[in-house]
């Protein structure tokens, strides 16, 4: 199939961008909702480990190996932003601000992670624009 779109929430949001970066003929559109868009950098591996542990005792190293494994960089949208720009992939990136709402309640880990994720989304937007990107919507 060609010309499809892929959208993901949280960890699947960064995966949606990665799928579009590496398979531009199949995915011409990609959407990311509240995803950490620089997972291999800084606190990324630790925060992913925290979230995965909180979600059921999973380990981040079971996903892409130890944090210095090349798989982390390969699956990092920030490091693949040039591919998205070169492919002219249409992207939509959304992220909340970490403030509690009726939907999310007052969940402290969620508020912390959403605030951290928002910072990564803003860095991704800056990198995308600096790379010459012009086919994105940011919310």
From Swiss-Prot:
InterPro entries xrefs:
AB_hydrolase_fold, Esterase-like
EC number(s) per entry: 2.3.1.122, 2.3.1.20
Query: Which Gene Ontology CC terms are recorded?
Result: cytoplasm; extracellular region
Known catalysed reaction(s)? an acyl-CoA + a 1,2-diacyl-sn-glycerol = a triacyl-sn-glycerol + CoA; 2 alpha,alpha'-trehalose 6-mycolate = alpha,alpha'-trehalose 6,6'-bismycolate + alpha,alpha-trehalose
Q: Where in the cell is it found?
A: Secreted, Cell wall; Cytoplasm
Which GO molecular function terms does the record list?
diacylglycerol O-acyltransferase activity; trehalose O-mycolyltransferase activity
Q: Where does substrate bind?
A: 10, 38, 116-119, 123
Q: Establish whether keyword Iron-sulfur is in the entry.
A: no
Q: Which residues form the active site?
A: 10 (nucleophile), 114
State whether it acts alone or in a complex, and with which partners, per the record.
Homodimer.
Task: Tell me the protein's name.
Answer: Diacylglycerol acyltransferase/mycolyltransferase Ag85A
Q: Which organism is it from?
A: Mycobacterium marinum
Q: Could you read off the lineage of the organism from its UniProt record?
A: Bacteria, Bacillati, Actinomycetota, Actinomycetes, Mycobacteriales
Q: Which gene encodes it?
A: fbpA
